[in-house]
Every structure is written in structure tokens, then in C-alpha cells.
Amino acid sequence: MLFFVDTANIADIKEAHELGILAGVTTNPSLVAKEKDVSFHDRLREITDVVSGSVSAEVISLKAEEMIEEGKELAAIAPNITVKIPMTTDGLKAVKALTDLGIKTNVTLIFSANQALLAARAGATYVSPFLGRLDDIGQNGLDLISEVKTIFDVHGLDTQIIAASIRHPQHVTEAALRGAHIGTMPLKVIKQLTKHPLTDAGIEQFLADWNK
């Protein structure tokens, strides 16, 4: 499973990139809205200067025709921009049109296996099932990853699964076990993955022994 960082904060992206494990970035309107110091397009240019992998940039339009035009504008910013489209009927139309133009797409706000299957059939490069938000309403978001992976494998679909709305390290472990191709998460979760109390204790013991 590859690691994406879910943020529009350039400092966080650079820090994640320095770890040597960053394969891409996902953003959304909520994350971009937190970045008051720069325009959306300028921030995307900054991000694509740092990251060579996929950078998902979400449209804010809701009508298919407007999504398509906005998607073309976003894709023109850099060759590694992936246009992020919400899972709606208009979104599916936009995905098909953008795919036909050779533009990569990431269908977001996936909460059912049927939604993921529709997005894949429309030509989506990626689908993003949301784990944490399903957990919040008493459903098991990780089961959705398993369902989508099985369906894609059975039908030979190339669309990749991005496990999104990752809240903690256990989400990462389980998403990887269940076959997600990518996990996108905040920098704080990536940092949590590096930690274990026995690792810290081992380092302390090594240093104590060395300094005797």
C-alpha cells in the first residue's frame, strides 16, 4: 500500500516528503479553505513542485458540464494533477468525459460498494472510500474496503482504491491487509506509524549500555 498525505498545508507536505515514503497528496475544499495565505491554483503549483506523484485537486462545481471545465483547468496546472470528483450522477458524467480526454480522476465521498463500482465503470483512476466517516455512524468502513477490493478483482477492474478518512494507525494496518492500494492520511497519523513504545525503550537501553 502506498502512502498519500491528506492536506493542503505545504509545510506538512514537505515534511512528509522528506520521510521518503510519500507517493502523492490528496486535498479537498475544506483543507484548502484552511490555507488563507495563497490561492488554490497557486497552492497546487507549490505542491506539484514538491511531489511528483498524484496530487488530487477537487472541483467545487456540482453540474457535469461545469465539473468538466473546472477539471480541465485543474489538469492544466501540472501533469500529475488528478481531478477529484464527488460521487453523484453528474460526477459520473464528468468522470467519463474527463477520462475520455486522458485526465486522471479520483471519485471521492464513496460510502458503498455500488458507488465504487459505478465510478470504476465510468473510468475513474481512483475511488476513495471514507473509513472514519462510516465508523462515525456505526458502520464498519474497513468492510467497505474489502467489498470494493473483491468486486474489482472479480471483474478485473484497474481502478485503484484510496482508503480515505483515516483516523489512526489501526485504520492503516487494516486497510493494507484488506487490499487498499493507497492510504491517504494526515501527517500526524503518518508520524504515529513510526512510533512504538518498545522501539523507544530499546533505543534508551542501547544508549544506556553504550554509555556505561
Curated annotation (Swiss-Prot):
Catalytic residue list: 84
Statement: the UniProt record of this protein carries the keyword Cytoplasm: yes
GO biological process, one term: carbohydrate metabolic process
UniProt subcellular location: Cytoplasm
Molecular-function GO term, any one: transaldolase activity
Domain of life of the source: Bacteria
GO cellular component: cytoplasm
Pathway: Carbohydrate degradation; pentose phosphate pathway; D-glyceraldehyde 3-phosphate and beta-D-fructose 6-phosphate from D-ribose 5-phosphate and D-xylulose 5-phosphate (non-oxidative stage): step 2/3
Entry EC number(s): 2.2.1.2
Keyword Cytoplasm annotated: yes
HAMAP family reported for this sequence: Transaldolase_3b
PANTHER family: TRANSALDOLASE (PTHR10683:SF36)
Similarity comment: Belongs to the transaldolase family. Type 3B subfamily.
The protein's role, per its UniProt record: Transaldolase is important for the balance of metabolites in the pentose-phosphate pathway.
UniProt-recorded name of the protein: Probable transaldolase
